[in-house]
Amino acid sequence: MRKELWLGLLLSSQAVLSTIYYKETFEPDWETRWTHSTAKSDYGKFKLTSGKFYGDKAKDAGIQTSQDAKFYAISSPIASSFSNEGKDLVLQFSVKHEQDIDCGGGYLKLLPSVDAAKFTGDTPYHIMFGPDICGATKKIHFILTYKGKNLLWKKEPRCETDTLSHTYTAVIKADRTYEVLVDQVKKESGTLEEDWEILKPKTIPDPEDKKPADWVDEPDMVDPEDKKPEDWDKEPAQIPDPDATQPDDWDEEEDGKWEAPMISNPKYKGEWKAKKIPNPAYKGVWKPRDIPNPEYEADDKVHIFDEIAAVGFDLWQVKSGTIFDNIIVTDSLAEAKAFYDQTNGATKDAEKKAFDSAEADKRKKEEDERKKQEEEEKKTAEEDEDDDDEEEEEDDKKDEL
């Protein structure tokens, strides 16, 4: 009882101390908070929908890409811009590739102040995070910006590829570590400096270091004790074909003495080579020693974004139909988890059940159509057979006359 009370008080204190900077569940008035970019005239449009299947129609409503082979650009301001200095930064949202996407992005951007009408793929951003699918590429993108450069994540964990809703969470901690979760399950973690090329390396190979002249690079050597067997060269490489016979029309006076054609000798052992043994002098692969990098500059603020002011989707999709929902930006993973429990976590089982039911109906419809087609083909074949029988009867009558 005391343990449960203590945990409850701890969670309550975390909730009191935490801050939710942005939250979006896409209610019917969502367009009052979001702006489609007009920087290009052919951008695709988002629409509000729960999709073809859902667990709860109201809770599962989100914005969906609605036009194939289109770029999309839409953003929403954060009421009060903020810096994540001294605290964690958590970005979370759900993605539902209902269309069984073949090529397209599903990522969200954290932005500085932006002119929403002019928002494009070239607009500077702080973070780009989320799934990316195109052909064999099925990965979670996590790009950070540092001093104006967009830095790719060294890791490429696989993203979810089914047509159900999945929640992606990125956590950048105040100690410069990070976590990536999918449906509240940790998929990756590490340090920013190790998993992004943010800073110059602390050490570099010494350009003055040279490989010693007596360094042995070969891991194996010829066995000096191995000797070629005395009968190794006894058999020649080729021999006359023992199954060949002189043709009956062979004339030695005209054709010369007949000789059987030569064939490969199955007993020939080939060129003898002494066997290899481990080289006792082998020292391993040589590499120069590491020395401190004179260009390395420590920075304990690589995780800090001074002005986080908006969220936005900047996407390209070949086949539209992705639904985005339940965005939260906070400084507390516990808050993000609680939000998940209230939204996707609360409806995922019902959504899966609805999906399974829709798939069963689809299979039944396909089976009914297949049977109908088979019956029509069978009926057509029987009618053709009857026509053939009638023609044969008429031909028989004509023959009798």
From Swiss-Prot:
It comes from the Eukaryota. One of its GO terms (biological process) is ERAD pathway. Residues 199-214, 224-236, 348-381 have a biased composition (Basic and acidic residues). An alpha-D-glucoside binds at Y107, K109, Y125, D132, D314. Disulfide bonds join C103-C134. Keywords: Calcium, Chaperone, Disulfide bond, Endoplasmic reticulum, Lectin, Metal-binding, Repeat, Signal, Zinc. A motif (Prevents secretion from ER) lies at residues 398-401. The keyword Disulfide bond applies. It is found in: Endoplasmic reticulum lumen. It holds the Pfam family Calreticulin. Residues 1-18 form the signal peptide. Its main location: endoplasmic reticulum. Sequence repeats lie at residues 187-198, 206-217, 223-234, 241-252, 256-266, 270-280, 284-294. Residues 187-252 are annotated as: 4 X approximate repeats. Residues 199-263, 341-401 are annotated as: Disordered. GO terms for molecular function: calcium ion binding; carbohydrate binding; unfolded protein binding. GO terms for cellular component: endoplasmic reticulum lumen; endoplasmic reticulum membrane. Transmembrane segments: none annotated. Residues 256-294 are annotated as: 3 X approximate repeats. Can be divided into a N-terminal globular domain, a proline-rich P-domain forming an elongated arm-like structure and a C-terminal acidic domain. The P-domain binds one molecule of calcium with high affinity, whereas the acidic C-domain binds multiple calcium ions with low affinity. The interaction with glycans occurs through a binding site in the globular lectin domain. Belongs to the calreticulin family. This is Calreticulin. It comes from Euglena gracilis.
